[in-house]
Amino acid sequence: MNGTEGPNFYIPMSNKTGVVRSPFEYPQYYLAEPWQYSILCAYMFLLILLGFPINFMTLYVTIQHKKLRTPLNYILLNLAFANHFMVLCGFTVTMYSSMNGYFILGATGCYVEGFFATLGGEIALWSLVVLAIERYVVVCKPMSNFRFSENHAVMGVAFTWIMALSCAVPPLLGWSRYIPEGMQCSCGVDYYTLKPEVNNESFVIYMFVVHFTIPLIIIFFCYGRLVCTVKEAAAQQQESATTQKAEKEVTRMVIIMVVFFLICWVPYASVAFFIFSNQGSEFGPIFMTVPAFFAKSSSIYNPVIYIMLNKQFRNCMITTLCCGKNPFGEDDASSAATSKTEASSVSSSQVSPA
């Protein structure tokens, strides 16, 4: 083995030289230079600085404006809550640990941070799955004129929590475990060891199949069918400027969704799977740290892509920030008129991303 395994940690460095120390008790500056930990700390501070207000404003504006409390926006609200959850319960701990060069909260704190980070990330991921399914059902109409109601939204939110808990809770109960990863400043599921005492191998396989591969397949299938359906509708209505506009908007949104999904999650999952599949292989702490922090940045990408590009929400947010008046003149009446003007067989409410 090219690493050093302890009771609650795995350091990606052999202890032949005797320099390896517990990541819960000593700075890990033998893994990376102090300035690298400073960069990590600054990066986490930036994510908090951007992620907290964006997600907080999403929650606040939705509560303030009744017209935003639609069934579909329940899922978007759940997504913002999950991101906010990650920022408060995960990013702050990682930043504090990076300042000290090791996971200063101890093994118990590692389990708590690992649980909350995993829970928030999984809620966000499964919220994207529910959004993809909703868009597919409404636009592609596999079930005729299906209407996404409040009950469906509540069930969708409940589903995201059930799936997230089914991933985050098992390590707390003895199926796998949470340990410090990368530069030892944040915690996640143990991909590094087989650890037969906690059946680690079976849990990692379960996690990759159920909580990564399946969501990825669902998202690609739903948005792939969505693009095809909108293109077919546009081809049948060449004279409809509204349909052409809808096609471009949906295509753009789908490309952004897929690209940022891949940027956020595929590097992390790929590196984790490589480490798990090559037990004992030599790799540095940076190898796992970089993709892990790409995944963390999803807390910023998600609200920007799924909510900030929504015209109605954007107008409501501007109104809230400007003390009840939109300086750009976008009021409810003009929004309503626009909605009526844009009505067609493939309406903007059916094909818009939110």
Swiss-Prot record:
A lipid is attached at C322, C323 (S-palmitoyl cysteine). The record marks E113 as: Plays an important role in the conformation switch to the active conformation. It is a multi-pass membrane protein. Residues 62-73, 134-152, 225-252, 309-354 are cytoplasmic. The modification N6-(retinylidene)lysine is found at K296. A motif ('Ionic lock' involved in activated form stabilization) lies at residues 134-136. Keywords: Cell projection, Chromophore, Disulfide bond, G-protein coupled receptor, Glycoprotein, Lipoprotein, Membrane, Palmitate, Phosphoprotein, Photoreceptor protein, Receptor, Retinal protein, Sensory transduction, Transducer, Transmembrane, Transmembrane helix, Vision. This is Rhodopsin. It comes from Bufo bufo (European toad).
